[in-house]
Curated annotation (Swiss-Prot):
Null allele phenotype: Not essential for normal growth in a single deletion. Required together with orc2 and orc10 in a minimal orc strain.
Summary of the function given for this chain in its UniProt record: Involved in regulation of DNA replication.
Lineage summary: Archaea, Methanobacteriati, Methanobacteriota, Stenosarchaea group, Halobacteria
Binding locations of ATP: T63, G64, K65, T66, C67, Y195, R207
Protein name listed in UniProt: ORC1-type DNA replication protein 9
Alphabetized CDD domains for the sequence: HLD_clamp_RarA
Entry's transmembrane regions: none
Length: 354
């Protein structure tokens, strides 16, 4: 049996679409040398067969937390034969079982695990018995875990090093017991700030060089994308991807200003929809309360939310949900902590100006 060669319609300006995707990890990262070196030093013991400290990587959305974590672990895998890495999105795998299952699945250890009947402790036992390469476990969006105690479980296993990624330390610490708070506070912290416009320009220029034909976008246009993204690399790359995709579909030879004008709004809408689709069930209920009745304060939101469910989460958890949705521009908050109110995000966000 012979395989037919698959041919694709050629792009007009996109040379490598992978480079424009949000999850792409480049061979070189821009303006994060200190953070890369810090995280690498935390993980170095595992390359010598020794336990490594847990690392906590924090910063606003779009500051490169996931990218840097994956970049460092990929570099480790290239340099050391007996080190592996696995990635878990805790927003998607938000229960203790799902997270443990995902890790074991990456190890090929889930053949006889039944989602409905296998107890959690058996999954931990399997991780304790795992005798494969030492492994770095990246827990992305770790503050989304329903039971953050899993961090303690993994931390106690010397075969694994753990990277915890979250927007804010306080959102993570507020939901764990004193034992784990003490452990986390003694962990190594890698903090990432929003990018400056000049740094975003360099990140965009690197993506253009790797993914697009020459001379399809100007330096001035990259500056305007950086300005519209306001320090958020994910949004900046999203604007570039949206503009390049539209120009390519229309068989343009370059990205024109008229295409760029609408790209920011389209990219924001795509990111917002992706974030909405990622909400776990109780977060979605909280969002619906704000959509139906907002603007509302946290106590009012909680009262409405409680009427919708039989097993409501705690007030503290709902406040964490509100904080998370604000960080990801699903909701917006106005006022001080005493009189704060939440509402849907205003859709009239800045565009890429001419």
């Amino acid at each position: 049996m012979t395989c037919r060669r698959i041919t694709f319609v050629p792009n007009f300006m996109i040379r490598d679409a992978r480079v424009l995707r949000a999850g792409f990890v480049p061979r070189e990262v821009e303006h994060r040398d200190a953070e890369v070196n810090h995280l690498s030093s935390v993980l170095e013991p595992i390359t010598n067969g020794e336990p490594a400290d847990t690392a906590i990587v924090t910063g606003p959305s779009g500051t490169g937390k996931t990218c840097i974590s994956q970049f460092v672990t990929e570099r480790l895998r290239e340099e050391v034969l007996n080190v592996e890495a696995t990635y878990v999105n805790c927003w998607r795998n938000y229960t203790r079982f799902r997270t443990l299952y995902q890790i074991l699945d990456d190890f090929g250890e889930t053949i006889d695990i039944h989602r409905q009947s296998t107890p959690h402790d058996e999954l931990i036992d399997r991780l304790q018995q795992y005798d494969g390469p030492r492994t770095v476990i990246i827990l992305d969006e770790v503050d989304q875990l329903e039971d953050p105690g899993i961090i303690y479980d993994l931390h106690s296993l010397p075969h694994f090093a753990v990277i915890c990624i979250a927007n804010k330390e306080e959102d993570l610490f507020s939901r764990v017991d004193d034992r784990l708070v003490s452990r986390l506070r003694s962990s190594e912290h890698v903090r990432m700030d929003k990018y400056h416009d000049e740094q975003l320009h360099d990140i965009l220029a690197a993506r253009v060089k790797g993914g697009l034909d020459q001379d399809v976008i100007t330096t001035n246009q990259l500056d305007r994308i950086a300005d519209a993204a306001a320090g958020d690399a994910r949004l900046a790359i999203g604007i570039l991807r949206t503009a390049a995709s539209k120009a390519d579909r229309e068989s343009r030879e370059r990205i024109t200003d008229d295409i760029l004008l609408n790209a920011a709004e389209d990219a924001r809408a795509q990111i917002k929809q992706k974030n909405l689709d990622s909400l776990i069930p109780h977060q979605r209920l909280v969002y619906d309360v704000v959509r139906e009745h907002g603007p509302l304060g946290p106590s009012e939101i909680y009262d409405h939310y409680k009427r919708k469910v039989d097993d409501p989460r705690t007030k503290r958890t709902i406040r964490t949900y509100l904080s998370k949705m604000t960080q990801y521009n699903v909701l917006e908050a106005e006022g001080t902590s005493r009189d704060r109110e939440y509402s849907l995000v205003d859709s009239t966000a800045p565009s890429v100006t001419q």
